[in-house]
Amino acid sequence: AIEWISTSKYSTKERYEKEFDNNGKKSYQNYLERNIIERKLLELDSKLVKRTKVAVITGYGSQKYILQTMVKQHSFKHIEVDVDTVDAFQGSQKDIILYSTVRSSGNKYGIGFLKSEARINVAFSRARCLLIIVGDMKFLDNYKIRGNKFPEIIKYITESEGCRIIEK
């Protein structure tokens, strides 16, 4: 099953990424996505009865840092949570994957390496039971960006049984 929790209907101030310098490289954080993932993890922990392996993954080191910090603030009873970047997660699998897309801005072409097919493949093929995507669906649903796979992914989710889109 696939679930997309879209941030598109939040204000730009809330949903837009923040840019950081990470050892001379640009990196991005998105606190709205962090907060949504925190609520989702708490919800999963309260609903699940069997110990479940969960991973929270993102393409950005700065986002990984704020997600790890948040996860450390909780002691979950029923979920075992790992946080990592998509690149570091290659080869691993978990029952549930939460994927933070991070990118959302006034630059409608600014999706960076989110359009990398290899990264999308890793992010979307590691969940045994449930993939939860958290991000600005309207921003990523842009056919004009060459190589952008998100419009196809969004179409698949909207047309497939067992998949759903959640909006504010």
Where are these regions (language model features)?
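Switch/connector loops and helix/strand junctions flanking conserved nucleotide-binding motifs
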Residues: 13-15, 65-66, 92-94, 106-110, ...
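A short beta-strand element within the Helicase C-terminal
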Residues: 84, 88-104, 122, 130-134
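Helicase C-terminal subdomain and adjacent C-terminal extension
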Residues: 71-73, 106-168
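Feature representing long, continuous alpha-helical segments
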Residues: 34-39, 61, 65, 69, ...
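Conserved helicase/translocase motor-coupling segment
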Residues: 1-70
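Short, glycine-/Ser/Thr-/acidic-enriched flexible segments
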Residues: 9-10, 61-63, 88, 103-104, ...
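Conserved RecA-like helicase motor-core motifs
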Residues: 52-55, 72-86
